[in-house]
């Protein structure tokens, strides 16, 4: 049994929360027979009408504005980046050009009308609309926010559409369905005047998220919601690819990359399928936070798992070199982060060695669905989940990577103290209500992660060793290197490497020397900086969301006087007065 005290519990619990990847719940603006609607966040829900025939109608602006949350700093600028303005007339033009149920496009003299647009979801990178047409057809329109470079958005859309096509043709079968893409454009040179994807709308379905309660009392209830995700996860693992990067249509990769078939067994497949897809540069965001040219080898594709792992260090060092050159970040923090990633570069090539993992299949190139989460799994609204067919949406964060680095989906990932029952905690009944709630939360998270792995072992036992404690420990530095939220998060990576060094022989059973070393001064500085960074994180409201507050929560906090607006237009947290 693990030792227990309140302080170590809170520390472990907080570290887990900071490492966890947050996923937000969508806001659904129900269409209630209105032709055009949106929500006005400051004053509560307000229906906004506009004429679909008047491009310059001022009321139309409200429909494109971001409403899902507020930033405590630079709110107006952050919202402006997420406006999704497009030409509604251009949308009608695109829909008119589509083949109708296998028939030719609509004749030029035939008028097609978009009768209603409804905002379904304002996500992290996209706004999602439902488009109703007067012939009864409904579509989903995805418009990316203007975040990152236009080139990065272009590659993401190209890869997302190709990946959806591949999964629909080669993976889904009768296990789940994938929206068909009817039209898309990865540039702004099109009738909508923006990058977009137009695809199937699945009527009568809910997100699995509506049924998911991560702390539901009955584990069987949670397991029933985890199993659909496991079924999809295991299906996506089945195709083996020839390289590491991201999927594209053949015409969207370089001639060099077009010469290599995308997946194992393609030479025996139908020619039109074998020639359809190729592996090109990865679309993982860490590789695009720079000004590298489109064909930079630092973004892949890579021939081996080892090359990919080494690239996770090389790209971070390149990004930091650009930051140092630009001079717009704290030089001391950039220098400290560079020192951390230089040590990580020494470690990366020595972390996961094939003879020590003892399962070469875990190094094979497989599909990782970065946003595999109940919010992106749709179930039939009128059926029990166990009997419902599944639909998978939102493929933007999908890449081809070593199987052992795909890992647990973020919504059930847990890196804190493992607790399975309250009996594991001495004197549980004597804890405060707050500590009991935290213990219960950790028990639920432990059970969720265990349940995912247990169910996956039933579906895809050949990959279960990716989740062994040893492989997970060795993979963790790679995960941290690819997913920092702040520049200072290099301290988390450094802390993880130091802990791994300490456990290298006694816990991990390694016979070879740990590849990286620290001086006593470096140990002391890391301990001091890490403690200060944790303290800042613990004392900063909405730290994990970088100051973003869900709109309903913002309105409640502001209305209750817990947030105050400054002269600069920013918001500050006002702690409640002690009675």
Curated annotation (Swiss-Prot):
Its main location: mitochondrion. The keyword Transit peptide applies. SUPFAM superfamilies: Protein kinase-like (PK-like). InterPro entries: Kinase-like_dom_sf, Mito_inheritance_9. GO terms for cellular component: mitochondrion. It is found in: Mitochondrion. PANTHER family: ALTERED INHERITANCE OF MITOCHONDRIA PROTEIN 9, MITOCHONDRIAL. This is Altered inheritance of mitochondria protein 9, mitochondrial. It comes from Yarrowia lipolytica (strain CLIB 122 / E 150).
